[in-house]
Amino acid sequence: MLDCIVNRFVAALICLSVIPSLASAADNLGVLGSKPKWSVLENYQDTITHDEFAHLINDVYCTHGFAQDLIKIENDAAQILTNRESRTTFTLRFASDPISKARIPRLWRPAKSLPSAQPDKPLGGLRIALDPGHLGGKWAKMEERWFQVGDTKPVTEGDLTLRVSRMLASRLKKLGATVLFVRNSTQPITSKRPGDFKELARKILIKNGLPQPRPDVLDPSDPEKQQTIRWQSEMLFYRYSEIRRRAVLVNTKLHPDLTVCLHFNAEGWGDPANPTLIDNNHLHLLVGGSYLQDELELDDQRFEMIRRLLSRAYDEELAISDTVATSMAKATGLPAYQYPTTLTTTKVGSSGYVYARNLLAPRLYRCPVVYCEPYVMNSKDGFARIQAGDYDGTKQINGVDQKSIFREYADSVAEGLAEYYRNARRKGD
């Protein structure tokens, strides 16, 4: 689920330098970020032309602009600032023309590099990781991905996404894919827990102008809960530590050709014990990009952006996302979500349903990522369909015959992936 209104206090976390206890004072990193290994980019020398690099920087990754000393695009190379204090830079050489480009080092395989597959197995040989968003279970209330209407079954996003991922897995396997789970239970991937981040949370709050932060939240409706050590330490656990550990799993053990992140969307519901149900229901997908200027100031995010750009994940994930979005739109009949602001996103692709946005998982996962955000959980229709659970065939909900929302989700993603790879794989092998 994406928060439709960005909380400025929370957003400020992203722009903080790491506290000296976690990194040297000269490091300029995001929350729980790692010091960049700029030498890794040597592997990408001569793999991209000037025009390709300039296009991806200006039209995809840095659509909100950037400080001119961060990235200087010259005729034959780009100068990328690695440390503002020391003024050191990394020189990325461009290939002189498309024919002379060196091979791109990456573990994932683009569709066009795969041999043709059997008609009924368009995903044959493909490694697909499924990443059901959030945690659910006992963590759902902490994540603020929980609400309940009266005596009905609570709606918990992490449990919903896990249910969809298991259904999707069986469909992808039938289509020939090897399916890997980033998460297949309600247990966190990270070994850390909120208590491990209390001291860091306290320092972050002090750095943000709260010299004596409160230790605990008074109640769920506490208007100042985001200024408490408890709330911040919980966020450091479930948002930052958890997603970073998932990235380690994806990048060092699973090595997928594609990761599918499964979410349900929502709009502000107010009191989770007495939530507001709304008429709006919509769909959109996300790809990595559209970095904010403040985000680009952080050394680790700038490094991660350049590394991802050079891997060419964007071209692959956009094409896949457009195809999956079209499949999901046809199956669900949902309109495209329209962000209320363009300050954090950039609309991309041809389907009308895909946006570029700088989210942690698509930034860190070293492969193409399809990030799905269908259905508004607290819409009247979405809520009714979630309450109806899973079932065969169709059931009349709000006067309309509808499939199980879980099967509709899984089927439409599987059909979109099958269509993309069926058309994009090499022909005639």
Specify the residue positions occupied by each region the protein language model found.
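Catalytic-site microenvironment of enzymes
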Residues: L2-I5, F9, S24-D429
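Bacterial N-terminal signal peptides
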Residues: V10-S21
